[in-house]
A protein has these predicted regions:
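N-terminal flexible segment immediately upstream of the FAD-binding catalytic core
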Residues: 1-72, 76, 86-118, 147, ...
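Flexible inter-domain linker/hinge segments
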Residues: 2-6, 202-248, 528-595, 601-609, ...
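N-terminal glycine-rich flavin-associated loop
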Residues: 40, 46-77, 81, 99, ...
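Iron-sulfur-associated redox domains of electron-transfer enzymes in respiratory
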Residues: 132-134, 142, 425, 429-447, ...
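Mobile "lid/hinge" segments at catalytic clefts and subdomain interfaces of large enzymes
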Residues: 154-250, 254-326, 330, 343-350, ...
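Terminal amphipathic helices with adjacent charged low-complexity linkers/tails
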Residues: 274, 308-416, 454-456, 599-600, ...
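Iron-sulfur-cluster electron-transfer modules
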Residues: 412-416, 645-824, 829-851
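Ferredoxin-type iron-sulfur electron-transfer modules in oxidoreductases and energy-metabolism complexes
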Residues: 550-581, 585-721, 839-845
Length: 851
């Protein structure tokens, strides 16, 4: 029998008092402090993990003000806070061991739209694709693109100054932010927008509480203007995090403090609302998918595409393409990326033209295609062909494959997984090929596998080396590669963070600034957050502070995973392989993953959340000296002799005795076992599979509810009940029956058996069937027309008309349908964790079908 897990980190008294007092301050949002909630937000899309003290989910700007004002009471002055959006950051931006303020659950309102002036005002928790879905009927869109656009929030995009495909033309998020409403750590609301430079010092037009910040930073940036322009890298992906350069427009006639906040990663203020610039949706789009016999050829050929005035050029390597071919998404694009067996695609450039002038686009596409034809005819640049697509559905399918590539890399086989830590380096595009050649040589010298894809037009290529961070030697290599790549980007006049923000990589910040400018950044932090209470450890520390930035070797998920024996990790590899990509947070209600997450908006009830629960459950079990054999369901059985002890444990549970296993159970109970995660998640983590294993072990310690036995035995009972459907349906429809079942079993809307039953309905259509023994003597011609139909209990006994109609249809199509005898398949047993019974049932069914 497994032990009770009670040794989990507890809240300290000050945090507990703060949460209680906040509730009394009429805080309207949600407050979460149990271990499951804290674990669900302990990770993002990076390798890092830090357990927060608590999570706050404000519903309004007023709620955020309440959070900050209460935190300024003397008793709570040492508490720190980290704002959080979609949690899609790849460098630990939104995780910390403090109080997390998550704006993604409730602050999701689109507040105001001005179609004529082309702007929209939104709350920080609005998802990027959600906004564009709202804007599409008006012919407008928010331009910055990113691969996580279906779950990344606008607040998160602003805080990391996100950008992606098309940035050469559309720029970064900060280029489209017109104004912000933020809450400072002192509880004051700060409104920022562009103001005339002449008015900043004398006729200050904005709210008085922001005057000092505006004027001080204005003067400092004015005084340091020459060195700022001279010393910062001249890149399309300019330096994010307190953007000293772009606070002024080109002629310095306007000053905008908003540019300091964009890219600040929650280290200066809580960004709550934003006014965003919108663009017309291009009426016409064309993709040219150029295929190469090597990735290096695709890389070196990209500048040629950029010179052809393309909107964007995206490059993908063979590793990513091969992983895509193994995923369900390849079926949607294989006709758009055809290849010959003797000439496989080893590199791909996705070239897009877009605009409102069809003739101009056609001319550009024709010109590029003519040049490509010439190169192919001459055997130049290793081009093996190209394909065009101009219809929107095809274009969207290509980009969906490209976006999913990020997650697909995490599904590589083996313990070493491609991970993000040097994946968004940026160098001047003219140096990219040489830089990547040196980058690849560095990785090859360590015999590492890696995948590459990205925005070569902007000099950004995503590189994810494959490492197993459970191996301490590879953790050292992680640090070594980080250090070497940082030096390499400096050598080529680039940046370590061209797209995804700094996060923990702020550790390298000083390498990219002169000492003078680094002190200016620290001064900005001091002005906004002098006591280092907002997302401490990121971007920089306040001037005159002795605090330190996070190390590149900050606490990682692997530090916890390493405590779990390898055999346990293998047994629960579905949960262990989750890399945090967060596709299960997709806002779109039409995406099939994950129903419980969509309804509850609680990340505990998502595949990622459930995987995190099971990983921690395994770690705690290992720390209680539970052996791998005890968590191998093939070697364990729930014994009747333990019934008394299970009864005693269940009484203790009813009395409120804590066991972390109960929190895991609560997360698993809301899973519908629909298995959408098994196909839609790029990692294919398959929650129902490890959920069944967890239930098996959980109920070795605690009694099962009666409804579990009812559901598990349905397949066995249904054939007998179906012999008298009218009788059973009569009792099922009685109100007293429904009331008793709901109160005792928690089940409502019980289905009715089919009347007449399946056998009677088959007689009506003249189906006679054949015994299995008769089939063995049939000729090959007769067997070729046979169609075997395998029954399941739900259609055969509760929706028999479907089976009858299908049999009738196959007869009319000229087949000889054979309805196989019903045999339980054990699915219900598996869902409820009756694994021993399921294994026996599944084996019997398999032997029957393989006859």
């Amino acid at each position: 029998m497994l032990p009770r897990l009670s040794n989990v980190p507890q809240l300290n008294n000050v945090v507990s008092d703060y949460l209680s007092e906040l509730q009394k301050q009429h805080f309207e949002g949600d407050i979460a402090s149990n271990y499951a909630d804290r674990l669900s937000l302990a990770t993002d899309n990076s390798v890092y993990q830090q357990l927060p003290q608590a999570i706050l989910f404000p519903k309004s700007v007023a709620d955020v003000v309440r959070i900050a004002k209460l935190a300024n009471k003397e008793k709570y002055l040492h508490l720190t806070f980290t704002p959080r959006g979609g949690g899609t950051g790849t460098n630990g931006q939104s995780i910390n061991n403090n109080i997390i303020v998550d704006l993604s659950r409730h602050m999701t309102g689109i507040l105001e739209l001005n179609i004529e002036e082309r702007w929209v005002r939104v709350q920080a928790g609005v998802v990027k694709d959600q906004l564009n879905q709202f804007l599409k009927p008006h012919g407008l869109f928010f331009a910055p693109e990113l691969s996580t656009s279906n779950r990344a929030t606008l607040g998160g995009m602003i805080n990391t100054d996100a950008s992606g495909q098309g940035s050469l033309q559309y720029g970064k998020t900060s280029d489209h932010v017109l104004a912000l409403r933020s809450v400072l750590m002192n509880g004051e609301i700060l409104d920022t927008s562009a103001v005339k430079s002449d008015d900043v010092l004398e006729n200050y037009p904005l709210a008085e509480n922001g005057k000092t910040l505006h004027q001080t930073i204005f003067q400092r940036c004015k005084e340091k203007r020459a060195s700022i322009i001279q010393d910062l890298p001249q890149l399309n992906r300019f330096l994010t995090g307190y953007d000293l350069k772009n606070v002024f427009n080109k002629d310095e006639s306007e000053f905008n403090l908003t540019r300091i906040l964009t890219g600040s990663e929650g280290s200066l203020a809580f960004i709550c609302e934003a006014k965003l610039n919108l663009l017309p949706i291009p009426k016409y789009r064309t993709l040219i998918n150029v295929k190469y016999s090597s990735f290096d050829a695709a890389l070196r050929n990209a500048p040629f595409m950029v010179k052809a005035n393309a909107l964007s050029v995206e490059t993908v390597d063979s590793k990513v393409l091969n992983l895509a071919k193994q995923d369900i998404i390849w079926h949607s694009v294989k006709e758009l990326l055809t290849e010959e067996e003797q000439n496989p695609i080893l590199g791909l450039n996705i070239v897009e033209y877009a605009g409102n002038n069809q003739a101009k686009i056609d001319s550009q596409v024709t010109a590029l295609c003519q040049q490509l034809d010439e190169k192919i005819a001459q055997g130049k640049d290793h081009i093996i062909g190209y394909q065009l697509c101009s219809d929107l559905p095809s274009i969207e399918r290509i980009y969906a494959m490209r976006k999913k590539a990020v997650g697909l890399l995490g599904n590589a086989k083996g313990a070493a997984k491609p991970i993000p830590f040097v994946e968004d380096t940026c160098v001047p595009p003219e140096h990219l090929a040489d830089y990547i050649a040196e980058f690849r040589a560095l990785l090859d010298s360590h015999n590492l596998q890696y995948g590459m894809f990205g925005h070569v037009d902007a000099g950004v290529l995503h590189v994810r080396p494959a490492l197993d961070l459970c191996d301490k030697e590879q953790v050292k290599l992680f640090k070594q590669i980080s250090d070497e790549v940082a030096e390499l980007t400096v050598k080529y006049g680039g940046l370590l963070w061209g797209e995804h923000g700094k996060g923990v990589r702020s550790h390298y910040g000083e390498k990219f600034f002169t000492p003078e400018l680094w002190q200016e950044l620290r001064y900005v932090k001091f002005l906004f957050d002098p006591n280092n209470r907002l997302n401490p450890g990121k971007i920089c520390t306040p001037l005159n502070s002795n605090a330190e930035l996070y190390s590149i070797l900050s606490p990682m998920r692997a530090d916890n995973d390493r405590q779990i024996p390898i055999q346990m990790r293998d047994e629960f590899k579905g949960a262990m392989n989750c890399n945090g990509n967060g596709l299960c947070f997709n806002f779109d209600e039409h995406s099939i993953m994950c129903p419980s997450m969509k309804v509850s908006k609680n990340r505990v009830f998502s595949p990622k959340g459930r995987a995190a629960m099971v990983r921690e459950w395994l770690r705690l079990m290992a720390n209680e000296n539970v052996s791998p054999e005890q968590l191998d369901f093939h070697k364990t059985q729930v014994k009747l002799t333990a019934l008394v002890e299970r009864f005693r444990n269940s009484i203790q549970k009813w009395r409120g005795e804590y066991d972390f296993s109960h929190e895991v159970k609560a997360a698993m109970d809301t899973c519908l076992a629909c298995k959408a995660c098994a196909s839609q998640c790029p990692i294919k983590i398959d929650v129902p599979s490890f959920r069944a294993k967890f239930f098996h072990f959980y109920h070795s310690r605690y009694l099962r509810p009666a409804k579990d036995h009812l559901v598990a035995n349905l397949e066995v009972a249904a054939p007998y009940m179906a012999k008298q459907p009218a009788l059973f349906n009569y009792f099922t429809k009685l109100k007293v029956t429904q009331s008793v079942v709901e109160k005792t079993l928690g089940m409502t809307d019980l289905p009715l058996l089919s009347e007449p039953n399946l056998q009677q309905q088959l007689v009506e259509i003249g189906y006679q069937g054949k015994k299995l023994e008769e089939l063995e003597g049939l000729s090959a011609t007769e067997k070729a027309k046979m169609l075997f139909i395998v029954q399941d209990p739900y259609t055969s006994y509760y929706d028999a008309k479907v089976v009858r109609d299908f049999v009738a249809l196959t007869q009319k199509l000229g087949f000889s349908p054979i309805l196989l005898p019903f045999k339980p398949n054990g699915k219900a047993m598996h869902i409820k964790g009756f694994l021993a019974r399921f294994s026996k049932t599944a084996k019997t069914q398999a032997e029957f079908l393989n006859r």
